């Protein structure tokens, strides 16, 4: 334990001093941005709260391990007519490599529009179903989710986020407890994602993009005769077309990026494995592609 004591007693105080002195931090690292300094402060707060065993390359907090940033360079000047649709994240229970995969697809397909299909956070602690009594506390799970989401936000600073059923769990609990919405903070304020727009659904190029709680995409295109892009169903990743004499519509399920080995996903251990992937739609909504992520 000596090396951990050294970190806490010798290194951590210096990091705190630097993070609390913006001028000094920017002198040490001239390119240091205020948001990066704030990010350092948050890391320190989490270390102080939960302790630290070692600093590793582990992409999420595992036990009491400090997370290494997975944020990637922002892809600039993408074509706004090309859409990247990112599957359910369920942070902090997201596959570490899923961020890199989605960022690669954005650049490969020159996507200037980014949409998260919903359930960006899991809120396992607040589930209406049984939650794991040995899992994270409410505060720790949220801290871990916020920290993980910060990597996604730094990589995709401008995005539209569809609100999923897991995202709204806390809002539902507050509502059923008689708490006025005036007391509830906005998603972007809780998650520190001021550049993201949170919406129930969005229409682009006459495509209905929604979380997917109303049935599968292939069924909805039959009943609504409108193209649909959805998430929610972790085991489905596909594009189906419905063609008539005067119309062509498609239904896309974009898969997900969940870590099936995490305790929060234990409810699905006896079902099909999740389809890890994302979707892109090119040429103003005319060319949908479902892209599986290579595993292993």
Stretches found by the model and what they are:
Residues 81-83, 113-115, 207-208, 227-229:
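Structural motif
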Residues 86-191:
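Core catalytic region of metal-dependent phosphoesterases/phosphodiesterases
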Residues 22, 26-46:
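Short, basic interhelical loop/turn and adjoining N-cap
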Residues 63-96, 108:
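Mobile, glycine- and charge-enriched loop segments
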Residues 40-61:
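Short, solvent-exposed alpha-helical "recognition" segments
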Residues 188-205, 216:
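Short acidic low-complexity segments
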Residues 2-21:
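Short, amphipathic alpha-helical "recognition" segments used to contact nucleic acids or chromatin
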Residues 205-293:
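Conserved beta-sheet core of the metallophosphoesterase superfamily
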């Amino acid at each position: 334990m000596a090396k951990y004591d050294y970190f806490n007693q010798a290194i951590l105080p210096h990091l705190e001093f630097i993070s609390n002195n913006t001028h000094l931090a920017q002198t040490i690292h001239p390119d240091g941005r205020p948001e990066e300094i704030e990010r350092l402060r948050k890391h320190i707060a989490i270390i102080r709260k939960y302790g630290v065993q070692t600093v590793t390359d582990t992409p999420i907090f595992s036990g009491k391990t400090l997370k290494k940033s997975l944020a990637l360079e922002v892809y600039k000047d993408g074509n706004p007519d090309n859409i990247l649709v990112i599957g359910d994240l369920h942070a902090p229970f997201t596959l570490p490599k899923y961020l890199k995969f989605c960022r690669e697809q954005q650049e490969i397909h020159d996507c200037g529009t980014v949409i998260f299909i919903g359930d960006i956070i899991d809120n396992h602690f607040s589930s209406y179903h049984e939650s794991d009594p040995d899992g994270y506390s409410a505060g720790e799970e949220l801290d871990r989710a916020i920290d993980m989401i910060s990597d996604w936000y730094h990589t995709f600073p401008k995005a539209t986020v569809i609100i999923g059923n897991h995202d709204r769990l806390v809002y539902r609990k507050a509502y059923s407890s008689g708490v006025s919405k005036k007391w509830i903070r906005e998603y972007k304020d809780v998650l520190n994602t001021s550049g993201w727009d949170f919406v129930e659904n969005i229409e682009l190029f006459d495509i209905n993009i929604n979380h997917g709680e109303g049935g599968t995409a292939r069924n909805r295109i039959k009943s609504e005769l409108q193209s649909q892009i959805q998430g929610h169903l972790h085991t489905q990743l596909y594009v189906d077309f419905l063609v008539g004499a005067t119309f062509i519509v498609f239904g896309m399920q974009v898969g997900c990026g969940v870590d099936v080995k995490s305790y929060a996903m234990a409810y699905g251990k006896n079902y099909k494995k999740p389809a890890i992937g994302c979707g892109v739609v090119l040429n103003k909504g005319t060319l949908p592609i479902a892209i599986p992520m290579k595993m292993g």
